[in-house]
A protein has these predicted regions:
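Extracellular, disulfide-bonded carbohydrate-recognition/adhesion ectodomains
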Residues: 1-222
């Protein structure tokens, strides 16, 4: 069948939503994403590192709930990292640290559940403390990068939740942590294609920031 692969003008990456009837686990989605190709470039579960990128991805999956993206804290509980694509190199890029405690005199976090007054989508840890609560999402006084958790997430509920979905429970662009083996109510996953690790888009039809290109099906840019 046809594919819809859409380019973001801000990241220059291409994105593809893969719907999976009956659900799919994060582990299986990660493997599946890395077997997909577009214009000669291998895919990976999307890494969302800015508000504009998050909004773009959310705009492409408005009718989908619980869609896997490339974040995990499977190595160290509460140490959330992008573990796929270019951000997944060298142990992954940390974007959030959500474990209680103090490191070198700096309060890392009050709890997994952020105070109701705090923003859930933050670009830096400083943005989450307008109400005077201790900084959450920081370690060794290094600010977090972008994150957009749903209220009271991540919470590592039950037996452990080490992977992330976007569009959690009808909340467009909001993230939640779930077990890596969870597949019920998962609508699919988002694949990102970008030029990294020596890979370049091979097709002359792929023109960055163009209005549209075609690769065996409808392929749009925005």
């Amino acid at each position: 069948g046809s594919r819809e692969v859409v380019q973001s003008g801000s990241t220059q990456s291409f994105y593809e939503f893969v719907e999976v009837a009956g659900g799919i686990s994060w582990t299986a989605a990660r493997t599946a994403a890395e077997t997909k190709t577009f214009a000669g470039v291998n895919g990976y579960l999307a890494t969302i590192t800015s508000a504009s990128e998050n909004a773009f991805v959310a705009s492409r999956i408005p009718n989908a709930d619980n869609v896997w993206i490339g974040a995990s804290d499977s190595t160290l509980e509460g140490d959330w990292r992008w573990g796929t694509g270019p951000e997944g190199q060298n142990g992954g890029t940390r974007f959030w640290y959500s474990e209680d405690g103090v490191v070198n005199g700096v309060q890392k976090n009050t709890s997994y559940s952020p105070p109701a007054q705090d923003q859930d989508c933050v670009a830096t840890a400083a943005e989450s403390v307008a109400d005077g609560n201790p900084i959450r999402g920081s370690i060794d006084n290094n600010l977090v990068t972008y994150a957009c958790w749903a209220p009271n997430e991540p919470n590592n509920f039950g037996s452990g939740e080490d992977a992330v979905v976007t569009n959690w429970s009808n909340s467009d662009g909001k993230w939640n942590d779930l077990p890596v083996t969870y597949s019920a109510n998962i609508d699919g996953y988002v694949v990102e294609y970008s030029e990294w690790n020596g890979q370049t888009f091979s097709s002359s039809n792929v023109v960055k920031s163009s209005s549209s290109v075609s690769m065996g099906g409808p392929v749009l840019t925005a």
